[in-house]
Amino acid sequence: MSPHTGWPRTVNSSLLKKHRSSLCTCQHTSSFLPRSFSTTADRHVQQSADFSSTSRSYDRLGRRAKEKLLDREFFLSLLSSASTKREAKSYLARLKAQYPKSPDENKPEPEKLATAPTLPSGVNLGSFYGASRSVYESPVFRQGPSPTAPPSLEPVERLHLALVRLSTPQSLDDNIIDGVAKTLSQLNRLGLTCCVVVDPGTEGVASTLRQVAIEQADRLAVAIQKQPDSKSLRLDSVFSIDASRPGLPQVSSRKALLNPLRHGHTVILTPIAYTEDVPRAIIVPANDAVLALTKELAGLASTPDPDEDPMVTAERIGRLQKEVSLDRVILLDSLGGIPAFNRRQTSHVFINMEQEYDDIENELLQAREMVPATETSLLKAGPSSIADNNPVSKFVNAEVVPVPSGPTQELKTAAPQRSAIEGHLENLRVAQKALTMLPAASSGIITSPFEVASSAQPSPTSEFSAVGTRRQRNPLIHNLLTDKPLLSSSLPMSRRGPTNNGQGTVYPVTSHTTFVKRGMPLTMLPNPWTEPWTPQSRPRLKLDDPSIDLPRLVHLIEDSFDRKLDVQDYLNRVNDRLAGLIIAGEYEGGAILTWELPPGVEDDGSEASNARMVPYLDKFAVLKRSQGAGGVADIVFNAMVRSCFPNGVCWRSRKNNPVNKWYFERSLGTWKLSDTNWTMFWTTPSLVEDSQKFRDYEAVCRSTQPSWADDTGVVD
């Protein structure tokens, strides 16, 4: 069996056990292991697992019982990380798409050859598939040599990777390191192999930082080896650098990096580069190492030859990009997610880089400049209403470093607070630079190792019972299964729900994890920052304006609603009352908003008429291929309620519309319209207290006529 065979990695796979044992015997002689490898396989490590039973009861269990407990813990972790069956099915569909069948597999086979048994690809479900080893290895009466399968000519299977940066692991205790190692092991079992860069920080001399990086890399490697069916390697001499020309380091050998990853090893790297002229070890910033790895794994590191045919260059780069898919860039930092100073939540749940990067960077820069001023004035005065209203003070006091009492602490807190904001700036910038080099499907996660480790802790229930409190969702596994953040970015703080700590006390759910996408540009017509959307705005935008691609807009609506639009009738209805248009990306999602008047109120442009106008969401559409993932709906909804109509908007939906649950969670109120099939939603504060406005909202939602071309009798 070739050591490059990509079997699914599970505890119950007997073939994997044979493969692993053969791999261990050849590790020291295999051609893919250069001298620079420092493998923990040479160390005697007790294979163990961290699950809910005590060590004594675990030792009394037999081998099969131990395997069942390990699988039980693994699958419980997965089930707790996926919110719905739809998310689990979506992950399985994406996983299946990663391993497409070759055209020859669909052809009938005239004769099956006796070959080595194959295992199903994708998420392995223990021994649910296939026969046992005794069946595979039973003797067969056959005279003459056994037939062999023809050599495979299929290309190398694409390797799906997560690039992880673990910051200052020397400050983390063993429980946190073990929790991180367990999560990395589970990601590996789910088909996402991890390459980890250990970041020792910047405090200390270069020689000390190099030693710390090596020690912490070995520490993490040992923790990963302790996980069931897990392998790790500390790989040295990965980076090279030209000392005469400052810049990013380069990956010395792509093959030496990818080979152990293809074997299922979690590869651990230190940010140490070696000069090209005279070999000398130089500590480089971990972020530079991450960007160098991203560039290499994205197939962009090769320098094009000016004499080479451009088509040949493009083909060569394309082959490199087909070898590897860098799906996730994960930044594990004790600071956690990117803080949100201008919003009610403590951190940004989701960042659409194309739209929000500049604003969030400026927000952090302004917060950094505010820290020294707040430090000298607020600490001496003690707690005050000013401090309570200052978003920077609230963040640094509650999230970064609690401020002790006493005058001796006044000068000691400014530096940590400023350093924390600079750390967030670095995390934001490295995520943006990395995602710029990757496909739009790739994403980034910025979270703390504490959150990852706490969600990886075993269930407190007995190993003999599956009944217990739902465990905290692991942000990394949840994101792999759903391609979404733990919490929706468009969900109001009041709707993010409580959580119980098991002792009767209920706490609000807050996320310190930031999900990052390269994302898509967002277009708002007219721009609400220069032309606010008000009833008095004249002249109004029209959908047949040259700045709007009407055919693509119509396709977006028809694809989302799965109905044919009567375009001319729709234009006649909305053109004279259009408030604005929101478009996400290349018409992947959008919203059409209008100013509507209740029946009987004349639109004469008077102040009384404008006061009765209702902000109305006429169409909210997302392409089918973008529904449920990518955050398109959240991007459009956030733009609507935060930028375009911050004072409120209303809309209607069929009472049996499956999207209503999503609407319920994001609206401030709902009202079922009697004698109709409609439910009215609104985000306007205190609407029910204004009886006239409420009646106007209801009248608009009752009277608006649809403009569908297919008269099926089904409303909207």
UniProtKB/Swiss-Prot annotation:
Composition bias type Basic and acidic residues, residue spans: 102-112
BP terms from Gene Ontology: L-arginine biosynthetic process; ornithine biosynthetic process
Region (Disordered): 99-119, 487-508
An example Gene Ontology molecular-function term: L-glutamate N-acetyltransferase activity
Family (UniProt): Belongs to the acetyltransferase family.
Free-text function comment from the UniProt entry: N-acetylglutamate synthase involved in arginine biosynthesis.
Protein name in the entry: Amino-acid acetyltransferase, mitochondrial
Naturally occurring in which organism (per UniProt): Neosartorya fischeri (strain ATCC 1020 / DSM 3700 / CBS 544.65 / FGSC A1164 / JCM 1740 / NRRL 181 / WB 181) (Aspergillus fischerianus)
Gene: arg2
